[in-house]
């Protein structure tokens, strides 16, 4: 069935990434088109730039934190994507719409709480404000 084919493609993609095995472009495209959200998260999980697969040193905020009032208002669930410094500079200079069209992207993803907790230590300094706000939100929930 179609669901089995999608599940198998996801399994293959994750297996190839986990084991640093080069993959056919067709497998990557199937996975990318079949589940964009998982595709982006896998790149976060493995510190890979969404564009070139090099080490992702940057976390691009699709929703600009400046619009939210600055980094002190940054939330872990804001939409973002993992990028290398070259591609992060590019998206900042040419803009989101042009960048997404150029690389056929569907945008960033909002991380779930579980995803955020699993990757926050891989991107040193990029989630500092998010972490502080996350802790404040949790404290307020418990009051």
Predicted segment positions?
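Short amphipathic alpha-helical segments
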Residues: 7-11, 78-86
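Polybasic, low-complexity binding patches
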Residues: 71-78, 89-143
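Hydrophobic/aromatic-lined pockets within catalytic cores
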Residues: 17-20, 53, 88, 92
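Charged, alpha-helical interface segments at or near domain boundaries
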Residues: 1-25
């Amino acid at each position: 069935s179609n669901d089995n084919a999608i599940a198998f493609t996801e399994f293959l993609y994750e297996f190839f990434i986990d084991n640093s095995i080069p993959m056919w472009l067709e497998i990557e495209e199937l996975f990318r088109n079949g589940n964009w959200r998982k595709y982006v998260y896998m790149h976060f999980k493995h510190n890979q730039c969404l564009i070139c697969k090099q080490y992702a040193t940057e976390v691009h905020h699709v929703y600009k934190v400046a619009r939210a009032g600055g980094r002190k208002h940054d939330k872990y669930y804001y939409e973002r994507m993992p990028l290398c410094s070259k591609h992060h500079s590019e998206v900042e200079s040419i803009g989101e719409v042009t960048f997404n069209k150029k690389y056929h992207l569907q945008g960033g993803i909002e991380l779930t709480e579980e995803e955020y907790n699993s990757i926050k230590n891989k991107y040193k300094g990029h989630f500092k404000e998010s972490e502080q706000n996350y802790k404040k939100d949790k404290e307020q929930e418990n009051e």
